[in-house]
Amino acid sequence: MNLTITSQNNEGYLSIVCKGNIETKEELFNHSQLLFNEIVKYGAKKILVNDIETHLPLELFPYFGLVQEYVENYPPEIKSLMIAIVVAPEYKEVAESWETLCVARGLSFYAFTSLDEASQWLLEMI
């Protein structure tokens, strides 16, 4: 996995920018763990993940396992997070499927293809 992650506090939320390639289920899980580590490090509750320059797997199957991993193996505090992930338009379908799975499991994780829409959503959340 060739991936860089940079983080900074913005007014109202934590901004995480990812760039690189994620090709396998294992790399997808590792990407999520790296993001969660950043969230814990900053103590953030509202997070914008800019994955526009991240190449993601297009198969839907790994995302089922990923969401199950969130619910079963991450700390319960994960349910208090509000995450807006922004992907390139070619990943819109897979990101929307991920969002549907997350929301169905009680997570406030939403997918966008616009940074402006994602940041506006986060700032409007209580």
Each model region followed by its residue ranges:
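Amphipathic, Lys/Arg-enriched alpha-helical "gate/interface" segment within cytosolic domains
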Residues: M1-I126
